[in-house]
Amino acid sequence: MTTTSKQDRIAELIRQATVIPVLTIERLADAVPLAKALVAGGVRTLEVTLRTAVAVDAAKAIIAEVPDAVVGIGTILNADDLARAEALGAKFGISPGATPELLKAVAASGLPFAPGIATASELMQALAHGFDVVKFFPAEQAGGIKALRALAGPFPNVRVCPTGGIGEANAAIWLAEPNVLAVGGSWLCPAADIRASNWAGITAMCAKAMKTLKAG
């Protein structure tokens, strides 16, 4: 798969998602019921971050037991993380930032991928390696929608998934931007609800959010 076709593939995955929940799973036992709760609420595209000791096993379990979930791996920082994501059978990968080494490794891999950027220079580096679908991170902290619009001036064809500081109150505002494919965030799976195994609450929250955001 060429870099262009991989970028088109991840663009379509992200566009179909509307919202990509960023999952930091602390307990392996939570992985499958959490994924099932999200899918039941209409949220199928999931980013499992490599931030915990159980992340790899959690992603494996979701891929094996929740076939309706489209599982990607987030917090990919280097070629070793990338190899883990590919070995798991992830459908896509996401990074919070990007080094030249990581971009080269991804370009040589078969994994659809969105590197993280926060500045024009970082975006130019991503584009130089063939990546025009990117994660804008941390979105609010890096200047918010004003910063995104400023980047869209010289880079009108870049497609973006903003993540960081996005929640129920501002998701629709971000999604209204013409270069935004979807938004990422953790508000659909609050840590307190996960700890309490409040799967029904998570499903209800997802269903409400998807109805509201897709209507907009």
Q: What is the predicted role of each segment?
A:
Residues 121-122, 129-132, 180, 201-206, ...:
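Ligand-binding grooves and catalytic loops that recognize ribose/phosphate and carbohydrate rings
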Residues 1-91, 108, 157, 168-169, ...:
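Conserved N-terminal beta1-alpha1 strand-loop-helix module at the mouth
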Residues 96-133, 137-142:
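Histidine/lysine/aspartate-rich catalytic loop segments that bind and position anionic ligands
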Residues 92-102, 135-145, 178-201:
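Glycine-rich phosphate-binding active-site loops on the catalytic face of alpha/beta enzymes
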Residues 125, 141, 146-167:
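Shared catalytic-loop signature of beta/alpha-barrel
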